[in-house]
UniProtKB/Swiss-Prot annotation:
Part of the 30S ribosomal subunit. Contacts proteins S3 and S10. Disulfide bonds: none annotated. Belongs to the universal ribosomal protein uS14 family. GO terms for cellular component: cytoplasm; small ribosomal subunit. Signal peptide: none annotated. Binds 16S rRNA, required for the assembly of 30S particles and may also be responsible for determining the conformation of the 16S rRNA at the A site. HAMAP family: Ribosomal_uS14_1 (MF_00537). This is Small ribosomal subunit protein uS14A. GO terms for biological process: translation. Keywords: Ribonucleoprotein, Ribosomal protein, RNA-binding, rRNA-binding. One of its GO terms (molecular function) is rRNA binding. Gene3D superfamilies: 30s Ribosomal Protein S14, Chain N.
Length: 89
């Protein structure tokens, strides 16, 4: 389990990115890079890092399921992820 402060910081960044998305887009179209640089640093989408919804783990993230490989494996074995089953051939 990741530190709660790291998870909270990532959520805060996500909110800032959503809040400034329109303004950022307009400034980029105008080419006003000075105003862009005055926006909060955490409002840049490049600073976001995908984290597992279950554990908050930043590595081994599976985009399709929004969770880490470890949490995915545990939930898949329990049958708690719809449409996922153990393969056999």
């Amino acid at each position: 389990m990741a530190k709660k402060s790291k998870i909270a910081k990532e959520k805060k960044r996500q909110k800032l990115v959503e809040q400034y998305a329109e303004l950022r887009k307009e400034l980029k179209e105008k080419g006003d890079y000075r105003a862009l640089s005055k926006l909060p640093r955490d409002s840049a989408p490049a600073r976001l890092h995908n984290r597992c919804e279950v554990t908050g783990r930043p590595r081994g993230y599976m985009r399709k399921f929004k969770m880490s490989r470890i949490a995915f494996r545990e939930l898949a074995y329990k049958g708690q992820i719809p449409g996922v089953k153990k393969s056999s051939w």
